[in-house]
Amino acid sequence: MVKLRLQRTGTKHDPHYRIVAADSRSPRDGKFVDIVGHYHPAQIKEQTTFNKEKILTWLKNGAQPTGTVLNLFKNAGIWAEYKTTLKK
């Protein structure tokens, strides 16, 4: 099963995360299939960048977001957009 999840990068005490599509059996920082965004929580205003087209494609193909990634998608409005495409 493919999951959309966070992959930690950055240095000690300064985490940066990639939002990746990866096999659920691979380790957190292991192999991934595709990078769909970035998340920098340590900045004053949390900075996130998304490739919306890739994310919607992965979701439509059955990828499951983890809890944290789902919250990021909800805050950015991507999850609502995905839900409206399902109803059509």
From Swiss-Prot:
A Pfam family reported for this protein in Swiss-Prot or TrEMBL = Ribosomal_S16
Task: Please name the SUPFAM superfamilies in this protein's record.
Answer: Ribosomal protein S16
Q: Please cite one Gene Ontology biological process associated with this protein.
A: translation
Tell me which stretches of the chain form a coiled coil: none
Q: Which GO terms describe its molecular function?
A: structural constituent of ribosome
Could you tell me the keywords of this UniProt record? Answer: Ribonucleoprotein, Ribosomal protein
Q: Looking at the record's lineage, which domain of life comes first?
A: Bacteria
- List GO terms (cellular component aspect): cytoplasm; small ribosomal subunit
Q: Which residues form the signal peptide?
A: none
Q: Which family does it belong to?
A: Belongs to the bacterial ribosomal protein bS16 family.
* NCBIfam families hit by this protein: S16 (TIGR00002)
Q: Which PANTHER family match?
A: 30S RIBOSOMAL PROTEIN S16 (PTHR12919), SMALL RIBOSOMAL SUBUNIT PROTEIN BS16M (PTHR12919:SF20)
What is the recorded name of this protein?
A: Small ribosomal subunit protein bS16
Protein species of origin:
Leptospira interrogans serogroup Icterohaemorrhagiae serovar Lai (strain 56601)
